[in-house]
């Protein structure tokens, strides 16, 4: 509700709901009741998301790391709920947080890149665009750093990009200054792959507390 008050109708307010969390469904229902505009969901396959949201007034979007995952989710949504995604987010292996890649592949640098995944996902959403009669914009995230990156992916067919880590260090972000300093002073050698509390691999900036 606070986010909606701040936005004052100037844009969408969305939540990122992690399938792997224990209060996944309850958190989504609470957000819907509070007036959220969209639910973006990953950290697992959000196969039941349309049923949990329960209303077409709220946009829904899966976070995927492959064309195969996109197809599986959208096929399930179409068959079981008669609904498809309002948009799709591709999260590459350079994203922060929980990743949908095998740890061995992450450590060996053998994961598919966004350049590999984007064409796959664009191809998989097309049948569902035709079935439901509307476009399904695809956004890319994870390792998008510059305007040149944005131009590159939009030229490939992405509707847009998602950036997050860069904005943690801004004045507007309410993270502690200590955390911001860790990110500002980190180099590529400080990025490590760990297991999160929900058991999924993900990159972090390494400190003595990690």
What are the residue ranges of the model-derived segments?
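Thr-Gly-centered strand-to-loop micro-motif
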Residues: 140-141, 163
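Catalytic cores of alpha/beta
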Residues: 68-81, 134, 144-159
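Glycine-rich phosphate-binding active-site loops on the catalytic face of alpha/beta enzymes
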Residues: 150-176
